[in-house]
């Protein structure tokens, strides 16, 4: 596994962790936070995986 794919996986895992923490801490803002973080993580993961 090369560096780019590794970073993509790490960013994806961080997004999942962030979503879980957001749900536990502040459920009222979970949708807006998950959407913003999810888009960034998903785009990063897809772009880096295309190497």
UniProtKB/Swiss-Prot annotation:
The keyword Transmembrane helix applies. One of its GO terms (cellular component) is membrane. Disruption phenotype: Mutations in the gene confer resistance to acridine-inhibition of phage development. It is found in: Host membrane. It is a multi-pass membrane protein. It comes from the Viruses. Its main location: host cell. GO terms for biological process: response to antibiotic. The chain crosses the membrane at residues 6-26, 28-48. Keywords: Antibiotic resistance, Host membrane, Membrane, Transmembrane, Transmembrane helix. This is Uncharacterized protein 52.2. It comes from Enterobacteria phage T4.
